């Protein structure tokens, strides 16, 4: 800025505008900065001259947001210059005090409360903090009287303590004030300051600021206590009594968010205040009463972590003092296990060495890390392991450096280094074990992630330097991480079904200088040939595995034999051409035997990584390959075009493809095979073509002329225009974006301009083509959007012309054509394209500028006469709303006091033209609604928009925004509409017009004058009250809640009779009861007399309506809505029955509940049943004789299935000898029902009930018990299968739990037959795929075992021991184990199982295991734990298996990586044969010799 301008402005106050702007404030701020010091010493200087202006500006509520921030920045500089002047001249200090009014000081000190945030601006709190701190400095300097100073600052502190501390500037203000006033003032003004502050830690984003505030107050209090007495022990005890009880209560509470805030920020600082605090805190933590040992240990674990992170505790004593930490590795909560690992493995001082006990503990418990199922916990684990390796490296380096010292204990230090190496070796072997085939996803992923992290630390000399992370020091030793066996396992995993596992394996292998264990050329060519075989696979993950294998081979082969990549590419190209020729003859045969996708994927990999150096060595050959591939892309398109462009591509079978012998041998339908072949081929073709066009322009520019590039761009657009299969054209979309981006960024003008005319061509296609009429316009919107996304530099220009053109097309009148009764609807395509543009997140910053005309277009489309346009208008409106409002969270989702929605003022300031448009449309719609009760369909989107807005809260001295004053009466009219849906959405819309603080007054006003209103008006008022309460009640302050319960209950009491009269509809009554139940019936405050009166009146009404038949009208017309009204009445009655039982006359609770179970409406019956199910006293309630009788009457077939299913499941909790006879259903009848064609919920309820009945039958009729038990076991086996749905498996588990293994275990006769099956089934449930089932099974298992709660893995280990000890010697048990071991898919012979595994399955999809938690090899090892020795059955089976292995692989010359023995099915079959053979002590020398000869899987070689 020109200095002369500044000086001129500083001399002329009149030059400042009456309504200052950002520029005027910036100019004035520069004036203050550039001014001389003497200008501030004069009484008529810069201070006095601008005081009035700045004072009025601070109070000006009409300033926009940027101007307010600029004003604060200017005042900050002004205050600093005044402060400096006052320090130099006391006279100026006195003058400032006399001039600045108390109101101005008050405004300055109130800024943190009034200017917490300004919508749309950042940095507001920083500016406010700066002004507040400078204001406090100046006030302390200029105030002449200590009394005045203390009174003002204490009053400021008192107000500040009531401000919203969800703002960091408020926390800072309190800290600054407390440092002046002292901590005693805080506790005087707010005795529960610490308790209130602790609750605010729930929001982690503010936890640090709030913790700093708490710490400031408590530290000052500690200093004041220290001044009172010199006894440090007494000071620490008194000080801890202030905060420790509340901290301990939260430590053992259930609020994880508060605990996280305390642990991260508050407690470490508190423990560091004085040396003795930590010991006292841990002592109080360990002696906290009324908590379990597990909870106490877990809390101590967190405390130890805090102390260790704070460097208060340096080393853990895992042998004595902290031995409990080792047991917590078996805790049920995975977060506790992770905390144990982090506590031992990590240390703030990374060079601190681990002890032998630390290594032993980690090594013995490291298995826990491979069973982490939760993705978030897994990320924490991986980061923790990385930090652990950093510490291990630093500590080993430190040890090695110390060993060079002359006085060091070299023997002890050398032992620590050796132990570190032993740990790493053991760790790698554990990772290796979890890479074997059939290991579950999380085990493989964690293992690979660990290894990927470990190799980046430079331990292995064979790792490329580019793959090693930079560090100041290295490990003092080296070791081989990936050996031949691990390398083989990773290569095998290249065809894993999961993308992330395949990619991670390839990344690890490529990080090595040479492929570990495969260094010869023959190894590379062998791998290459295996990769070629996989390229011809049907399944996509196998194709990709083959492509990755060849990519891996190319990477290493090119290093040793230059030109290998070219030679390999030619081989792949020839195979691709051969398969294309097969497709010309028969698409079906090509889909089965000669797919294209694998070769296309591989070629894409080759050209993505192709370096110019390789091309230069044989330029002409590479050019020929590129041109052949580009032509091949057109050939492929010609082959698959008819399939993908068919009106019904999913069921299209080209002529002649359904004939021939190949069809009879297919496992998939021909149409499915051809379609999959076609769209996958196109997907990979588009990807390859894009890579070729973008990569090779710089290599062969003479071949890729603008004409050629334009031709293939139009070809891609043709794919998007004509293809009907959504999977196909959506796969082209990202490729077309990449291609257009490349063209736009090209430095050649004639190429960079190519996409522009494509955009116009797309717009022409919308109007010209009528063959694309689909509900979402196929790929046309993607074709246009791709160009807009790609044109980064031209994006604003392109979007402007595109959106304007599309809106113009969408507004064109529809012309009907009588050709085959179809419509040519470019309007539909235009609106669908707009929807795609506004949905695309990469265009959000630009597209939002055109939201206003698009919203208007979509609203008008709601009223269109044609359904296709109305339909796409709805979809467009949804996309626009999501773009305007961002998050899809419900409106009432509040984040701890932060209003993060879009206010009405902000919305209409962003989209100003919508104000008049929406008002005009709303007036028309309401007028139509009033005249003929037929709303314009545009009314719904308008009200929907308002329902998503929030009230425009004024900031500071701003006046309330009145921009919606014209909308308010219109929306209120809608709440009284005769159309229910209009009333509902209008009531939600009203919430944006109401200030939360005025909610109580508003509700009272709504409840006045209810008498005489029509039913629709009453219903509308109740809907409005419900919407307002739902939106605002959770945001009320404690004082506002108290006011609410003092005022509103009386208003409800006054109109209670009107709402519940016979004239009021049951819909309105139900809504009335719903409001009472949600906001009044749960409040049991006995001091609120009016509230309790309202609750009693509600309870009496519900009882009268439910139990007094005369209270219900008999006129059929007046009973509309009665069932749902009675359902809500039943909900209230049942939830409060125990509390109000004194008002239930002489009737018992059992009688009242049984009456509801017999009610005429099934809604009431369902509500009653669900209330019993959810009750913690369920068993007591069900065993009430009257309730039991009622439940039994709900079990016959003529009852509604949902009612019947719930009743049956409840009866399982009630059975005793009396109730069993009353039930009237025998166990055989239950079995018949389960085996019948009853609906699944009924069957599952009978299964649960059957477990209880058999338990009772055991004591009454043992013969029948034995027969029924066997049938029950068969049912459990069929319903516990992993392929059964969750509800069926849970029903089977519940049946076992109701049978009660704990009590049944003591019955001797139970062990005389198949009782062991229940133990085996419970073991299966302990390893179920669903965590809820595992937890339920673990709860029952540790009750039977008599142990404390532990992790499921540990419970399972104990359960295995108990099962074997109890049943291991029984013949039937061993027979069952043998059957489980050797039976596979109904086949018993090992040789047949091996043949089945070896046979190639050409189906598109394999049958996937549903249990991804419990792997096959884990299950095998557990079954072998039970199996006896000697065991002739297993011996015969294993012998057959060994002979099968020897014969099937006798002629194999080499199996190797990706070979047959690496196939998961083949591997597991062979592994099972070998493990069972080892169990029965059969010799395996021939098998091991064979596997060594053919290079079989490492687990089979010795």
Swiss-Prot record:
Gene knockout outcome: Loss of methylation of the 2'-O-ribose of cytidine at position 32 of tRNA(Phe). Increases occurrence of 1-methylguanosine residue at position 37 in the tRNA anticodon loop of tRNA(Phe) and decreases occurrence of wybutosine at this position.
Pfam families listed in its UniProt record: DUF2428, TPR_Trm732, TPR_Trm732_C
Q: Name one GO cellular component term.
A: cytosol
Q: Which GO terms describe its molecular function?
A: enzyme regulator activity
The GO biological-process annotations, alphabetized, read as:
tRNA methylation; tRNA nucleoside ribose methylation
Location of this chain's protein in the cell: Cytoplasm; Nucleus
Keyword tags: Cytoplasm, Nucleus, tRNA processing
Per the record, the domain of life is Eukaryota
**What function does the entry list?**
Together with methyltransferase trm7, methylates the 2'-O-ribose of nucleotides at position 32 of the anticodon loop of substrate tRNAs.
The family assignment reads:
Belongs to the THADA family.
Name this protein carries in UniProt = tRNA (32-2'-O)-methyltransferase regulator trm732
- Organism, as annotated: Schizosaccharomyces pombe (strain 972 / ATCC 24843) (Fission yeast)
Gene name per UniProt: trm732
